[in-house]
A protein has these predicted regions:
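A short glycine-rich, Lys/Arg-flanked "PGG" loop and its adjoining helix->strand segment in the class I
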Residues: 89-103
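Class I S-adenosyl-L-methionine
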Residues: 116, 120-122, 127-164
């Protein structure tokens, strides 16, 4: 499992408790990385690997066809138009990610930010050359701190699940 932008580590920690798989997390913020490392050391957990940095720069360290699935739960939506260039989901990134995911395995993107998720859906549709729809099930994804916050504000949670 590749968890991109795991924040304070909720999704990694909960996924590891439910599944007996290796989990690789990439996060650009040091606080989240440190929290997960502390948790790993405290419980002497194996099979969780964390990387601090930009996923666009780090993704190439992994061999092709390495990940069973990719989770991108509540990434920073960079809501201001002038910051949209900071969003990492692009056709270019999807093409690089495609090489790293085993065939027929899924990418799961979740957000409560409507402009971000519709823009992401458009990019994915253009890249895959098909019309994806929002998923009406949340599968077994963990409820993170960010989702709890969104739900407390009565935001709608959007899930896009697709195969690269």
């Amino acid at each position: 499992i590749l968890d991109i932008g795991f924040g304070d580590g909720d999704s990694i920690i909960k996924a590891r408790k439910r599944q007996n798989q290796k989990i690789y997390g990439i996060e650009s913020y040091e606080i989240g990385v440190n929290k997960v490392i502390t948790y790993i050391n405290k419980l002497k957990m194996k099979d969780i690997y964390v990387y601090k940095g930009d996923v666009v720069e780090i993704i190439d360290i992994f061999p092709d066809k390495f990940f069973d699935c990719v989770n991108i739960f509540f990434p920073d939506p960079w809501p201001k138009r002038r910051h949209h260039k900071r969003r990492f989901i692009s056709k270019y990134f999807l093409s690089r990610l495609k090489d790293k995911v085993k065939k027929t395995n899924e990418v799961h993107i979740t957000s409560d930010h409507i402009n971000f998720i519709f823009d992401t859906k458009r990019i994915v549709n253009e890249y895959l050359k098909k019309n994806l729809h929002f998923s009406n099930h949340r599968s077994d994804r963990p409820i993170t701190k960010y989702e709890k916050k969104a739900l407390s504000k009565r935001h709608i949670i959007f899930d896009i699940i697709f195969n690269l």
